[in-house]
Amino acid sequence: MSAFLAPIHFWMYDKILIAQKLTFAVEEKFLNKEERDEAESLFPALISEDLEEVIDQSNIHGWLHTAVSNVEIRFAYVIKKLLDKGISLEDIKKVAFEYGTTFPKYEISSLQDAYELLMDILLDGLPCDVSISVIREEENELEFVLYNDIHKQYFNEFDMEASVYHELREAFVNGLFEKYSLKYKNIIDSNKLISR
């Protein structure tokens, strides 16, 4: 465990904020103020872009773990609330896709570059929580596997399948990849494909 902030902690915090902003985008589109306030009271948002302002430096790992859990559970809670209100998954996916299109254009010259971009953006728990690896790489396709799906526990807590999360993730990444003419597909919840 680290006793001081290192680049990996800022990298993780950026990923947490990206996930939180997706939740906010969905909330803004579909929830009224009272419903947003309820989500905030149950699962308070991180209020600063500056990690040093908010983190408990005496418990860096524990604080980051709690922040990951909080952003994941809030997202699952909001999605369940929307589905219960009759908002279609397709409509929620449109918001996720649009959020993906808001990212700046990065230097992507290969499928490996696209994969590395995803590793910098997607929140899959702390590095100690998950193992992700490329299992197949060809000229026009790169397949990777997520060995420990941390999202499942949060969606299951609200009686949803992890596949709901992965459909939303697919929409978000396809929004992100639109400017590169790349596609992202869930083969199954644990296997992902990036293709030209």
Identify the residue ranges that each predicted region occupies.
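N-terminal accessory segment detector
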Residues: 1-137
